[in-house]
Amino acid sequence: MAKILTVFYSLKGETIAPGMKIVNLEKGHTAVAAEFIQKAVGGDIFEIETVKTYMEDHMKMIYEAKEELEKGIYPELRNYPDIDEYDTIILGYPNWWNTIPTPVFNFLEHYDWSGKRIIPFVTSGGSGLGKSVDDIRKICVGAEILDGGAFLGHEVENSEQEISAWAKKCVQAQTNP
């Protein structure tokens, strides 16, 4: 049986809800989805955390993130898990400017992914995976990268059954090729 690590990057605080309404989240959408996934498939869970704190004002934060992406600035992370013992990494993140957030770029570039399976999932306002899976494939040479799953951020809290079923299907597909 494969050893699974669910890794996620998520922001809490201000975000945009449908209708361009600003809401304040105690826990980010991706964190909620990651917890559902870990509960459904087992294994361990790890949150990617940056040393710096992003701006609390959501609109300012998204432009800060865009500038990081355009300049290739990847914020320093608090720590990195030892992934050697894991066969499968379920990787969750919000869609930032049609790709993975810069902290996730940093995380991915830290490892040799040879022989690993990566199952990406994204939370977004409706833009889906964007080009994130292509970007993951470029970084994680030697890994098998599944196409991934996309979940609407504002619906995550009420989507445990859907998210869990998706995760179980992905993990089952790897154990029964």
What residue ranges belong to the model's regions?
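N-terminal beta1-alpha1-beta2 submodule of the flavodoxin-like/Rossmannoid cofactor-binding fold
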Residues: 1-88, 98-99, 105, 161-177
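Glycine-rich, charge-decorated loop segments at or immediately adjacent to ligand/cofactor-binding or catalytic sites
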Residues: 126-139
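Short, flexible active-site recognition loops that position polar ligands and cofactors
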Residues: 148-161
